[in-house]
Design a protein with these regions (language model features):
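Acidic donor-binding loop at a coil-to-helix junction in glycosyltransferase catalytic cores
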Residues: 175-182
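Short, well-formed alpha-helical segments that are part of the catalytic scaffolds
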Residues: 26-39
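Active-site donor/metal-binding and catalytic loop motifs
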Residues: 195-213, 222-226
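Glycine-rich, basic loop-to-helix element that forms the pyrophosphate-binding segment
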Residues: 70-87
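Conserved donor NDP-sugar-binding/catalytic core segment of glycosyltransferases
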Residues: 104-131
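A conserved acidic beta->alpha catalytic loop
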Residues: 47-56, 96-100
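Short aromatic/hydrophobic "clamp" motif used to bind/position activated sugar donors
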Residues: 92
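Non-catalytic, C-terminal membrane-associated alpha-helical segments of glycosyltransferases
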Residues: 214-221, 231-359
């Protein structure tokens, strides 16, 4: 359990074996993010299409930074994989460039991951005086904050889990929703996500309709993931989406108010538009890279977009899909293998070795 007592010597050792991994493109708020990292951990920046201003900021930054870069702009899964391959640290703490850590959070999350392989902190969503900013904060709280999941940030995990969840950190094909797919494999392996509510990060306020662009991209990722079989596909898509959206909007109105539910309805439209856009146009040109085993995993009761919790039937269907793709993901019977006294020396998995060579 993450609440088990851990000595300070073990925590210091854990900090020395931790890397904060941040995917970065053109967000200059990365300066505030780095400034909030109040421990001597490795800081890994995984660049994907960086702007000149970002490159200048990195070159002039006083703290040591490990920098890697991918050509696939906007591919968060590939960026995180490159970041993981660029470091040999045992514990990977995923963070976003538009967020900052509260004091002491890095240490708290390292302490927790020493006795729990995956630990999730809490996001505090900022808001401005604008109505859309306030509604965005309420919707984000509802959509990501009312259940425990492996959606990042902030998320820290022991890289030893990778060999137990299919041999890879994140799916590079789906571009978006990469943390959602990661969460599904954790459930297949029976690896729990421990929630640490006191580990708070602050998300910068979002303005205008920027959040709709994010949900559109999530929809594209959903479309790719359904085609490759790492997400389930509803057997009757239109009816399922109508049912799932109606139920979710009722819950949103109950928990966050009618205004938030109305805005969430627009986000749902953006999400499903993104899925249709992928079906028609393949905007990331990924279909040529699908494995030969790629096929839809159809179910009558598909996985809701709002939650990552899998039913027993959904677990069986996804386990079968991974097995058909050549990945056997079995339940881990002894989680103590991930404890700091049993982890052994820090080292990368075979998948990490391959990605390091690619980098």
């Amino acid at each position: 359990m993450a609440t088990d007592p851990v000595g300070e010597a073990a925590v210091e050792k854990g900090i020395a074996r931790t890397a904060v991994v941040i995917a970065l493109r053109d967000d200059l708020r990365i300066a505030d993010c780095i400034a909030s990292i109040d421990e001597d951990v490795e800081i890994v920046l995984a660049l994907n299409g960086p702007s000149d201003a970002v490159l200048k900021l990195i070159a002039e930054h006083p703290r040591p930074l490990t920098v890697t870069e991918i050509d696939d702009v906007g591919n968060l899964g590939a960026a995180y994989n490159a970041g993981a391959a660029a470091t040999d640290r045992q514990y990977l703490l995923l963070m976003d460039s538009d967020c900052t850590f509260a004091p002491g959070v890095v240490r708290a999350m390292v302490r927790a991951v020493l006795t729990a392989p995956v630990v999730k902190g809490q996001v505090v969503y900022g808001e401005s005086d604008g109505l859309l900013s306030k509604l965005t904060a309420r919707v984000r709280e509802f959509d990501e904050g009312d259940y425990v999941s492996a959606l990042s940030p902030p998320l820290i995990y022991n890289r030893a889990i990778v060999d137990r969840i299919g041999g890879y950190h994140f799916d590079e094909l789906i571009h978006w929703c990469e943390d959602r797919e990661f969460d599904f494999r954790l459930q297949l392996a029976g690896i729990p996500v421990v929630y640490l509510p006191e580990a708070r990060i602050f998300h910068d306020a979002q303005h205008g309709f920027a959040n709709m662009r994010s949900y559109f991209r999530y929809g594209v990722g959903e479309g790719i993931a359904q085609e490759t079989g790492v997400f389930t596909t509803p057997a009757v898509p239109a009816l399922w989406r109508l049912y799932e959206a109606s139920r979710t909007l009722v819950h949103c109105a109950r928990d966050k108010g009618a205004g938030a539910a109305a805005y969430y309805a627009l986000l749902k439209v953006a999400f499903h538009t993104g899925t249709v856009h992928h079906l028609l146009n393949d905007p990331y040109r990924v279909r040529d890279r699908y494995p030969a085993s790629a096929k839809r995993a159809r179910m009558v009761r598909s996985i809701p977009q709002h939650s990552t919790r899998l039913t027993k039937a959904q677990l069986r269907r996804l386990r079968r899909a991974h097995w058909e793709a050549g990945r056997r993901i079995e339940k881990v019977t002894d989680l103590s293998v991930f404890h700091q006294d049993a982890a052994g020396p820090a080292g990368a998995s075979a998948a990490d070795d391959t990605r390091q060579q690619q980098a």
